UniProtKB/Swiss-Prot annotation:
It comes from Hyphomonas neptunium (strain ATCC 15444). InterPro entries: Ribosomal_uL4, Ribosomal_uL4-like, Ribosomal_uL4_dom_sf. Pfam families: Ribosomal_L4. This is Large ribosomal subunit protein uL4. The lineage of its organism: Bacteria, Pseudomonadati, Pseudomonadota, Alphaproteobacteria, Hyphomonadales. Part of the 50S ribosomal subunit. GO terms for molecular function: rRNA binding; structural constituent of ribosome.
Amino acid sequence: MELAVKTLAGDAAGNIDLDDAIFGIDEIRGDILQRTVRWQLARRQAGTHKAKSRSEVNRTTKKSIKQKGSGGARHGSRNAPIFVGGGIAHGPRVRSHAHDLPKKIRKMALAHALSSKAKDSSIMVIDTCELDSPKTKGLIQAFKDLGIENALIISGTEVNENFARAARNIPNIDVLPVAGLNVYDILRRRTLVITKEAAEGIKARFDGAKAEAE
């Protein structure tokens, strides 16, 4: 797949060939993307939710009413879940929400996410993401000229500090290095913007995963 390369100023900077095995998949597997997004979001959950059970509520355990003669039901401890202020039955506990997902599926999902952007013509290649100064105003104008409004920008191995500082105040713009590229962030933004260095890094990342699998 061949795409035109532009500069941040909007000028032409040649063309680049993207690997069809990564960016040119025809049949996008929505089920694989859904599984991977669920896996990512589950890993992000803190899992610190907690409700006290009847054994953890700090109340007296003295029998609340006498066994017989009250005309009501028999009751013992006020810690029981049926009482106001009692423990919670089957309430949330501190736990990890993470679950396993094979590396093969994660690699496949990343390729399908990248291909989905290419298939929708929602991918853009720029030559570099480097700025001389961290000026947000100038970057906003550059994005406007390029038609970038809601985008994930993959800058390369490292993120230029001035570019990162200028971009972090712009809504709906995310900037990540190649190592941070993930399915969820690709899908949540309308456009995927990569640099030439990032394109090489993505190819190397997939080649490394392939070599590891072998």
